[in-house]
UniProtKB/Swiss-Prot annotation:
Xref: PROSITE patterns: CADHERIN_1, CADHERIN_2
Cytoplasmic-side positions: 626-784
Region Disordered, annotated ranges: 676-700
Pro-piece positions: 22-59
Protein name per UniProt: Cadherin-15
Phylogenetic lineage: Eukaryota, Metazoa, Chordata, Craniata, Vertebrata
SMART domains with a match to the protein in the record: CA
Amino acid sequence: MGSALLLALGLLAQSLGLSWAVPEPKPSTLYPWRRASAPGRVRRAWVIPPISVSENHKRLPYPLVQIKSDKQQLGSVIYSIQGPGVDEEPRNVFSIDKFTGRVYLNATLDREKTDRFRLRAFALDLGGSTLEDPTDLEIVVVDQNDNRPAFLQDVFRGRILEGAIPGTFVTRAEATDADDPETDNAALRFSILEQGSPEFFSIDEHTGEIRTVQVGLDREVVAVYNLTLQVADMSGDGLTATASAIISIDDINDNAPEFTKDEFFMEAAEAVSGVDVGRLEVEDKDLPGSPNWVARFTILEGDPDGQFKIYTDPKTNEGVLSVVKPLDYESREQYELRVSVQNEAPLQAAAPRARRGQTRVSVWVQDTNEAPVFPENPLRTSIAEGAPPGTSVATFSARDPDTEQLQRISYSKDYDPEDWLQVDGATGRIQTQRVLSPASPFLKDGWYRAIILALDNAIPPSTATGTLSIEILEVNDHAPALALPPSGSLCSEPDQGPGLLLGATDEDLPPHGAPFHFQLNPRVPDLGRNWSVSQINVSHARLRLRHQVSEGLHRLSLLLQDSGEPPQQREQTLNVTVCRCGSDGTCLPGAAALRGGGVGVSLGALVIVLASTVVLLVLILLAALRTRFRGHSRGKSLLHGLQEDLRDNILNYDEQGGGEEDQDAYDINQLRHPVEPRATSRSLGRPPLRRDAPFSYVPQPHRVLPTSPSDIANFISDGLEAADSDPSVPPYDTALIYDYEGDGSVAGTLSSILSSLGDEDQDYDYLRDWGPRFARLADMYGHQ
């Protein structure tokens, strides 16, 4: 360059020991700033190496370096610096003397925040013109060991199986140091300060890995190990920090379960199941609740019928002996069981064998009162339909399992819905006590079910329940009959028409019903000569003519027989009308009339029809009379003045004397047959005012008249209620003002029965002839 900066690194602090030398020029890096001091020679500016300064410097301000320019004399150059630490954040860390070029440190440095600063230096003349090109000034912060190492966790956790071999990895401890990792200030070393005795674990000082160093880890001895860890910088000679490591020992099945006794004694009641009779205690040193601890029990011998089982109590790990099949004291009084115990998890091969891996269990059976037992339950038997009372059904006896107690058994009924059976209380013999109806609702598919009880005489007694199922055998007690109607018609020509189809029914069930056999009565020889019956199927036959017979009604005697054992036979009369037929095989119209008159309606049938007609007419008449009587009674209850009560020469009059202003009465026909109200000459159709109503009275709205006689009572009740609730009418308990009606009265005063216009000894004995309703009057006024 034309002119070079003469950088004088005036070491104000002798401790740094820095000396600056002008490097020899190198042609390969020559810049075109020349200064002709000699032919063929160029001078270059100083190359300034990084300036190092320690962090945490206490003496401030502290001189770092001095820069100078050789272009002008001292005092004619102004120096300045720019960059981070000067006019950029962090500000005011560095400053420069503008006349001397000395650079000062003004604040304490922290390498962990900023490890170097890059500044720009400027040289100007007094007029502010640039004398030299700007040059770079780099300041490097030298690290000090001012940060302790730190573990990433306060507590490190690891797990390892007991019995692990040496060198087994457990966990890894990790730590950091904020100092310069390129220096010993961040060179960390790990160690174990404390772990107890014996020492089963070691830590790699460089990586922090924790591993086992010897055998002998036993969870049953020590389940958890607590280690104190340390990390130090300066390769172990500097600052330190500590943390903890918790190592849990996982369980393996290295301990076999053992019984606490060589023999257990228990008692069990007979004839019960699903009950616990005792517990088998075991010990296991492995982790409670784990598969290495949970016990499983096996009955090796002594229970060939599988009457016992052993399950494990999950809380106590005890074996619970339970009875799954009822025991019988009379069959066996004692059981000797041999039981073994193992864990759910298999035992480790290196584990020692248990001394009490098996035990004996003695179970004594207690004798109890057992209920009687029916050898055959349910008991099925059969009896003929319609069996008479006293017919033996079965003997439903039970036996007592308690052979040593010599108990007596009694029998009774528990369920016999038809009360059909009778049970001998001592023997259990069952017989009928009446005839069972075939239509009983308790017969299901021909079976009748009853429940019998057997009771011993123990205290308290025991009861057994037995079911008796009785099949009611069908008996052929009904003969077949022709299906209705037992009549029909045939063409007079034998070859005409399809014939007459005959059907039969039977109230008996199979096999006492169909097939049915149809036969003309052999006792009437003429039937076989003129008529024939051919079987169609098991329940129907066809009747035909062999020869032409006279037209009209013919009565044929038929024999019907079923297939029961023994068979039942019925003789039945068949009414057959023979008529002339057309080409289609049906009776001609004239013949049909003849046939209709002789279908075979008997005199009894005609009487029934006529009687039914008469009964129907009588019922209709009674219904009409009852309707009229009810209407008349209803009218009497509402309008007492309309009754016409005639008692010989005594008449009932409604005359109440003269002087009444209101001469208009209700028309009952209008009540029974209301019509629409017609408009009158009164304005707005208002009704006439009552004479006893105040002048401010406002008539009530028109009420709708009843539409049927049955509503008359409601109509009158509504009118009474309207009058009672009328606020414009004075109340009944106040004095009313009536218009003057004049003196005297056309009608005289009412006289008593004793006051007579004739002689005083009038005879009232005729009142006795009027019936019980006048008996009281006859006693009062008749001759004594």
